[in-house]
């Protein structure tokens, strides 16, 4: 009973203290909500698994999905085939998925996961087709992460963070949301 009260209390806190509004197209999606947000992408420089420095704020002109994940997160692993398909579908239209590992297991674990993991994709096996950067919970919070994995932030062509994704969202909903951003 105490646990139920605690969950209700936390939920009420986030409901009444949220700076976000629910996206009407995603609010009925049983897989998870997409919320509106409006903040400029802060200057953030992260290192990729191939030791390149990537300044996220220099990606204006691109629509980006900053996907926060960890190797131990089942939802993160489950949604990866959808992200691979979305990257394939929209990469030639100025869109990219950028995975940001906030894994407490370290860079070696993340690198092994990315290099050795094959994802089932339409009856075949496929590797990741988007960059993976090393981050931390603190960096993710600076970028709009509120906690809970999987999670993501959609950034428009002007470098504004416009949507936050909490939990696993259906591929169809995410595709529709990205398509709208690409058309604006």
What label would you give each PLM region?
Residues 65-66, 97, 152:
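Hydrophobic beta-strand anchors of alpha/beta hydrolase catalytic cores
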Residues 114-157:
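Short, internal strand/loop/helix patches
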């Amino acid at each position: 009973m105490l646990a139920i009260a605690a969950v209700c209390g936390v939920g009420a806190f986030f409901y009444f203290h949220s700076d976000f509004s629910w996206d009407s197209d995603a609010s009925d999606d049983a897989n998870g909500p997409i919320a509106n947000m409006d903040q400029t992408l802060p200057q953030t420089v992260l290192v990729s698994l191939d030791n390149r420095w990537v300044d996220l704020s220099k990606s204006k002109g691109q629509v980006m999905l900053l996907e926060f994940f960890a190797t131990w997160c089942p939802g993160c692993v489950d949604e990866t085939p959808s992200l691979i398909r979305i990257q394939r579908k929209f990469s030639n239209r100025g869109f990219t998925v950028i995975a940001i590992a906030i894994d407490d297991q370290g860079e070696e674990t993340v690198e092994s996961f990315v290099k050795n993991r094959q994802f089932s994709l339409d009856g075949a096996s496929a590797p990741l087709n988007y960059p993976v950067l090393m981050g931390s919970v603190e960096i993710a919070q600076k970028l709009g992460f509120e906690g809970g994995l999987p999670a993501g932030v959609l950034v428009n062509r002007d470098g504004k963070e416009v949507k936050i994704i909490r939990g696993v969202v259906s591929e169809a909903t995410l595709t529709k949301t990205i398509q709208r951003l690409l058309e604006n």
